[in-house]
Amino acid sequence: MRSHTITMTTTSVSSWPYSSHRMRFITNHSDQPPQNFSATPNVTTCPMDEKLLSTVLTTSYSVIFIVGLVGNIIALYVFLGIHRKRNSIQIYLLNVAIADLLLIFCLPFRIMYHINQNKWTLGVILCKVVGTLFYMNMYISIILLGFISLDRYIKINRSIQQRKAITTKQSIYVCCIVWMLALGGFLTMIILTLKKGGHNSTMCFHYRDKHNAKGEAIFNFILVVMFWLIFLLIILSYIKIGKNLLRISKRRSKFPNSGKYATTARNSFIVLIIFTICFVPYHAFRFIYISSQLNVSSCYWKEIVHKTNEIMLVLSSFNSCLDPVMYFLMSSNIRKIMCQLLFRRFQGEPSRSESTSEFKPGYSLHDTSVAVKIQSSSKST
């Protein structure tokens, strides 16, 4: 293995040398941001070899882009093909699919950036737009998954008369509020970037110190805290859902369909496992990452933090591939709708089986009619 010497150098922005696969972390110690491309503030740079990391990121994001694009387009096609009135869960899932697609559309920019030896040539504004859109849609998906777990928990634990407490209209309002808040934050970030002006850096998706941008670091910290609150909500909701389903399964063990309750309970925990694998590593490491940005750190430590953060981010992006996989592999109704729509699309005639206009949720991963079955069986026992 080749050894690399990490050095600290002070140079002007306009004279940064770039080798084939070397990048320099940028630490701006100036109190004021550069106002134009001719500015030459003193910066401390940390060169390092990123050849292997760039290869891994390019390959990973390419796979995620292809699989995620196909899966989410099909998922969106299926959700839009449901002609009957959608329930609240379907509204949330539709918006999750849209957020996943928007995140996936950001990946080609990252792929080209790493292919181009970590050089960004499209300007600081587009860099900020792509980066902010990426994170915006990731957190929209996280928030909506939290609302899905809350929705299921409420409907399963309330009586039949109260089970419509969360209506379709209310779920639409929730999604609209989430999107408006996200877009408001997005526009704020872009406006702040425009006010700061451009800088002569060809780096985009990389580690940057926050010594003079503590407000942005605090905002990132708030997002991390929000994630852990949502994660706690999901854990409590699905544990409660799983316990209820398993209890009903034992009570109705003599009935032919008793196994469906246990299957749905297992599926609920699979959702929790996938959410944990994709998002928990990234957000657990974010505390270290943000702390490193705010404090003076060695180049060696910055290199470790940067590379670890990039790998964790790949895991988070991979969730956009797993969402449609969960829809289809773990929900017989979604698979049925997909087959019906594809059959009608390619054969030009409706399927003999149940049409999409008569779609009735059953024991799927996110469907909520199981709440009615649980409450009914509870009262009958």
Curated annotation (Swiss-Prot):
It comes from the Eukaryota. It is found in: Cell membrane. Residues 83-88, 150-171, 238-269, 332-381 are cytoplasmic. The keyword Transmembrane applies. Keywords: Cell membrane, Disulfide bond, G-protein coupled receptor, Glycoprotein, Membrane, Receptor, Transducer, Transmembrane, Transmembrane helix. Belongs to the G-protein coupled receptor 1 family. Glycans are attached at residues 28, 36, 42, 200, 295. G-protein-coupled receptor of lysophosphatidylserine (LysoPS) that plays different roles in immune response. Acts a damage-sensing receptor that triggers tissue repair upon recognition of dying neutrophils. Mechanistically, apoptotic neutrophils release lysophosphatydilserine that are recognized by type 3 innate lymphoid cells (ILC3s) via GPR34, which activates downstream PI3K-AKT and RAS-ERK signaling pathways leading to STAT3 activation and IL-22 production. Plays an important role in microglial function, controlling morphology and phagocytosis. Disulfide bonds join 127-204. GO terms for cellular component: plasma membrane. GO terms for molecular function: G protein-coupled purinergic nucleotide receptor activity; G protein-coupled receptor activity. Broadly expressed. Highly expressed on mast cells. Residues 1-61, 110-128, 193-216, 291-310 are extracellular. It holds the Pfam family 7tm_1. This is Probable G-protein coupled receptor 34. The chain crosses the membrane at residues 62-82, 89-109, 129-149, 172-192, 217-237, 270-290, 311-331. It is a multi-pass membrane protein. GO terms for biological process: G protein-coupled receptor signaling pathway.
